[in-house]
Structures are given as structure tokens and as C-alpha cells.
Regions:
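Outer-membrane beta-barrel proteins
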Residues: 1-129
Length: 129
């Protein structure tokens, strides 16, 4: 089924700066297919600083009762700066009480700096007793 949402608010700091923030999202789970897709768009309008827009997408697929794969992407745009971009790919497998998960994550232009990129890998094991 479809899930949608929207939120907004005003933020005022003790220094007197103000910003307006809003976010909206949509997620759709395809019944019987094991497929879920989602998207989120957020915006922050600052009185005294650059505006920021964020767009994220995600997709997951339950291949069978034991195997799932997922992908996510996020872009953070700041006026007058290099876009920060992040991606992640994940896979998980469960066999009885044993679970294993692997993910690869990459972020480019961290803090909008063109020379600040990172990659990371995670491996997780779980045991249920």
C-alpha cells in the first residue's frame, strides 16, 4: 500500500536567525511482490545562510523468505556549494537463527567539500538463541 506524509516548521535560534523547514515523503509497498520503493524531499530555507534541499530514494526487494537486497541514494544540495551525494547497497540473508548482512556505503563531497569522500563496508552477524 501507499504511505505519504508531510511536515513543516519554523526554527529560530538564540542568535536571531530563522529558517523554514519542510519535508514530504511517499512509500509504496507492492503487495505480494516483496518490493518497496520510497522517496523523501526536504527543504530548509534560511534567512541568513544558504538554502538546503535534500532528495532521497530507496528501494528494497525481499527475494525470498531468507534473502533481501536494498539500495538507497541521497543528495544534499546547498546553494553555491558542491552537492553532497550518498549511496548505499545492502544484502541480508537469514538461515534459521543465523543472520548475516553486508552493506557498502559511499559519500562524496562530505560537508560540500569536493575533496572529502568516504567509503565504508559493514558486515553483521546475528545469532538467536
Amino acid at each position: 500500500g501507499l504511505t505519504v506524509g508531510y511536515g513543516e516548521g519554523d526554527v529560530e535560534s538564540t542568535t536571531g536567525t530563522k529558517s523554514e523547514e519542510n519535508t514530504m515523503f511517499a512509500k509504496y509497498a507492492f503487495d505480494g511482490l516483496g518490493l518497496t520503493v520510497g522517496m523523501q524531499i526536504s527543504e530548509k530555507n534560511n534567512d541568513s545562510a544558504s538554502d538546503v534541499e535534500t532528495t532521497g530514494i530507496g528501494i528494497s526487494y525481499q527475494v525470498n523468505d531468507d534473502l533481501a537486497i536494498s539500495y538507497g541514494s541521497n543528495t544534499l544540495e546547498k546553494v553555491g556549494s558542491t552537492d553532497q551525494e550518498a549511496t548505499a547497497i545492502g544484502v541480508s540473508y537469514t538461515m534459521g537463527s543465523l543472520g548475516i548482512a553486508l552493506s557498502m556505503n559511499q559519500v562524496d563531497n562530505i560537508a560540500h567539500s569536493g575533496s572529502n569522500d568516504r567509503e565504508g563496508y559493514q558486515l553483521g552477524l546475528s545469532f538467536a538463541f
